[in-house]
Amino acid sequence: MDIVARKADLLRELQLVQGIVERKNSIPILSNVLLEASGESLAVAATDLDVSLRGSCPAQVARPGAITLSAKKLYEIVRSLPDSDVHLRIEDDGWASLDCARSHFRMAGLPREDFPSLPEAAAGAAPVELPGAVLRDLIARTSFAITAEDARYYLAGALLVLSRDGVALVATDGHRLSYARRAAKLKLGEALRVLVPRKAVGELQQLLQDEPVSFHQAQNHLVFSVGGRVLASKMIDGQFPAYEKVIELKGDKVAQLEREALMAAVRRVSLLSAERSRAIRVGLQEGRLELTASSPEMGEARESVPTEYSGGPVEIGFNAQYLLDFLGSAGTAQVSLELRDSESQGMLRPVAEGEGESTDHRYVVMPMRL
């Protein structure tokens, strides 16, 4: 292999695969990135056996070929180079030689034959075109609710729900649930529900722009194609909890609040909440929402946020970080808080602005004992 590529083009693709590669791996080649030169491009790919990403950049290919090199080291080297052309070639001893301006590097590689094969499109698989900007918005509104506990594998991802008239994403960790849906016209036969693993959701978010996304299933993989790159992930083989009734529950105590004012108040009050629980007390009464937090070791904090609420008083405990996650993603000037009593879940929603297209975003949070 002997190629020349622009530093910026090569760096962009190497940066995107960094999240795929596992830093500590019992299989050495999984720490490597696959480089394949042919035609007028250099293909760049990485996998952890569950999630894979393939991209490419323009290149002048003097001699086609392939090699795998340390993804982390190659990225660090290319990032440090001056803005110039990068000359990469495989030498007779199997090592890779990299030159740029007055810099020269030699790197040990592993043969392409040892690199795992990547998922291909299944024959006859009909892709569905999804609006990229919509999918990116839904991920931003839900991904923080995905559980970090791999043991609860059926919660370790987001449920993607596709229908002819919309796209929805749902995530939960058992303590809170975030649901977001946007109307969209999809060329789809039957409605589709698939569980997208947490890591794949994060990597997809990095790829998404305003351009459409092509999605299809290939054997036991989910495949997303966007901007000339292909992200493939194994499906989660599990049953996502029934969420439909949960997001329909309504509280009779409804307050509308300024999102930024509430977010700032929660952030300040939570500074003196217990470090492990992050619990704060939320008290709703006529004209105001009162937030309090206390810790035997640190002290206590109190702040009120004005609201037009005129119902009966209610007090409930919430995890402050759960509230901040929603408030940071809601994107509207106003949000609504719906409560029933101190022992039932609360519902938060963005308040739609104007008559433009909006996201149906519902965030259900379980209460905490205080």
What are these regions (language model features)?
Residues 1-370:
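Structural preference for solvent-exposed beta-strand-turn elements
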